[in-house]
A protein has these predicted regions:
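N-terminal Rossmann-like NAD(P) cofactor-binding subdomain of oxidoreductases
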Residues: 1-170, 174-177, 204, 208, ...
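Short, well-ordered beta-strand elements within core beta-sheets of diverse protein domains
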Residues: 56, 224-232
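Oxyanion-binding "anion nests"
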Residues: 180-227
Length: 276
């Protein structure tokens, strides 16, 4: 980390001072970051020469986020965004790299369309999808197309940010509704599984997804219970043994490139009864 930026309220402060009342992680602030001076995020030119790309975790209106992420890209700075604002922009890839690395091809069209020279915007999907999209893709890639999918998520309280869900709602309870989460679940997987056509991402038609998203009293880690209906005759469907073999042998381009943050084994199958 070589550059940090936030609202004008924090600009000019050392990072350790800007977050002193909000640092909630058990570990200390990393030494290399603690003394970085926080810049005003509204001035992308301040990032020039200080970083190769930026992570965006903005808490603003969607139109404001789109405008600011675009401004960084126009300055020649690639943007990797945690925000949902650009997830449905046709020429912005929504990446789980093991699955849809080919969607990076739309960046050339994005640059052309917006006049970006070196910058671009890429986004990550909704956090709960990341738990089950790779096992789903592994089966599809192995020749077992999926027609329908029923998903029930049990999502950790930390996913709601801080201070998060009120304690009276969470203690001894499961919250059965997370606003907008089911819609994201049912739509985003189709973009991730889609294909690039004429410089834009064309959504997949299948699987048809029905989802229920709940908040559970767990600090970290989302769980998903997924039921699949294969688009195959009964005698062509994979056995449990075949499914496990497909999952445990699954690798993709990030593993082939030996990228430093890519897991060596993307899918780990656990057999214990007390494990997901």
């Amino acid at each position: 980390v070589t550059y940090v930026a936030a609202s004008p309220r924090s600009a000019g402060k050392a990072y350790k001072d800007a977050v002193s009342s909000r640092w909630l992680i058990g570990a200390n602030i990393p030494e290399g970051v603690a003394d970085l001076v926080v810049e005003d995020a509204n001035d992308p030119s301040k990032a020039l020469g200080k970083c190769k790309f930026v992570f965006s975790a903005l808490e603003m209106g969607k139109d404001e986020i789109k405008a600011l992420e675009k401004a960084y890209a126009q300055e020649g700075i690639p943007v990797v965004s945690n925000a949902s604002a650009n997830r449905w922009t046709e020429d912005v890839p929504m990446l789980i790299p093991e699955i849809n690395f080919a969607h990076l091809d739309v960046i050339a069209e994005q640059k052309k369309h917006n006049g970006f020279e070196n910058g671009f915007v890429a986004v990550k999907p909704n956090c709960s999808l990341q738990t089950y999209m790779m096992p789903l893709h592994a089966l599809i890639q192995a020749g077992y197309p999926v027609k329908r999918m029923i998903v029930t998520t049990l999502q950790a309280t930390s996913g709601a940010g801080y201070p998060g869900v009120p304690s009276f709602d969470m203690i001894d309870n499961i919250v059965p509704f997370i606003g907008g989460e089911e819609e994201k679940t049912e739509k985003e997987c189709l973009k991730i599984l889609g294909s690039v056509v004429d410089g834009k991402i064309q959504n997949a038609e299948y699987p048809i997804v029905s989802s229920t998203c709940t908040r559970v009293p767990v600090i970290d880690g989302h769980t998903a219970c997924v039921s699949l209906e294969f688009d195959l005759p009964e005698d062509k469907k994979p056995s449990l043994e075949e499914i496990e073999k497909i999952w445990t042998s699954y690798t993709s381009v990030p593993q082939e490139l030996n990228l430093p943050s890519a897991p060596k084994q993307p899918i780990v199958v656990r057999h214990e009864e007390n494990r997901p």
